[in-house]
Amino acid sequence: ASDVYKRQGIPFEGHYNILVNPFPIFPRHLTVPETAHVAQRIAPRFGDMLDLARQLTDYTIFYNGPKCGASAPDHAHFQAGNKGFMPIEQDWRRQVAGKVADYGQATLWWLNDAPRTTLVIESADRKTAIKLFDTVYHSLDIQPGEDEPMMNVLVMYEDNKWIVFVFPRAKHRPACYTAEGDANLLSSPASVDLGGVFITPVEKDFIKITAEDIAQILGEVCLSPADFQKVRKRIQEQL
């Protein structure tokens, strides 16, 4: 399997390979795996994610945690999709609920977009963006038996700054994923779904899914309003 990660592509930063995604969701969809077989973890490679967004300015870069919709949960990788596909890229400024914190050249916002729970880092400086992300990371609970907090992350670079969307998670999959009969919906949301484009792998689900179903699914996998408020408070206490 490791040969897949070394096949012909564009090398990036000496230890990634930029490949065309063989199962695209976007009109232009890339996969960026680590060349070495290492675990899917964001903490040591968030700076790499910023660098990738800085180089691929026509793309939004995304990270799915190992139990947050990752297509290869046991191998470190990012994905990238062309900008203009996910509604959140254009919509987020209209959904700002407030400022969590200012830090150096960066601001951390939170959005009024329930049932999603969304934090947005806006930064012209790489080090400051990393510091804010680390603060968010350490403000999130880690589930028993897991190595990192559950989250999905989107990063794009525009107007000489990074925009980072962090979606903290409470749950891997909604109840409908394992439900029996008509209640069954094979929805396991990842970054793209949280960015506003819901993917249904099975046609029957595409036909029957409703706005209420989507709200229910997001409400289950994202934080509760009370937990989201606690996270924002923890962040402010650390800065």
Segments from the language model and where they lie:
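Short, small-residue-biased leader/transition segments that mark boundaries at the very start
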Residues: 1-5
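Hydrophobic, conserved cores of late-appearing folded domains
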Residues: 6-26
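A generic secondary-structure signal marking the coil-to-beta-strand transition
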Residues: 14-16, 28-29, 162, 194-196
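Short hydrophobic-aromatic micro-motifs
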Residues: 17-20, 32, 80, 165-166
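Residues forming anionic-ligand binding surfaces in small-molecule and nucleic-acid pockets
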Residues: 20-36, 110-117
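Conserved His + Asp/Glu catalytic blocks
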Residues: 39-47, 52-61, 66-72, 81-239
